[in-house]
């Protein structure tokens, strides 16, 4: 089964707020089926200074169910309303793993 991985990039100079918000988001996404939720920061290249959020799901089915559940979660809605006050979404990509 191929894993589904979502990569989301944010621009923000508010490191403490990014970390605090990512910790809250991690609990929400993992509660709803993400295998993991990770955050890192680019230090070189075209995206230097941007933040990267990575979530992984076991399959498209799990991904779909998780997205549906997250969309209905009041805690997630609260986070989504807060994020624009300190960060800007700059990109999102989804990759499908290849089982070797």
Mark where each language-model region is.
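Short S/T/G/P-rich N-terminal loop/turn motif that feeds into the first structured element of a domain
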Residues: 1-77, 82-100
């Amino acid at each position: 089964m191929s894993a589904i991985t979502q990569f989301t990039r944010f621009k923000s100079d508010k490191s403490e707020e990014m970390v605090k918000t990512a910790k809250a988001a991690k609990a929400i996404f993992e509660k709803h089926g993400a295998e993991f939720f990770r955050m890192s920061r680019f230090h070189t290249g075209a995206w230097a200074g941007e933040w990267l959020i990575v979530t992984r799901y076991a399959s498209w089915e799990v991904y779909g169910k998780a997205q549906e559940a997250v969309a209905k979660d009041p805690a997630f809605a609260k986070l989504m309303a807060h994020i624009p006050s300190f960060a800007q979404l700059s990109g999102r990509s989804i990759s499908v793993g290849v089982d070797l």
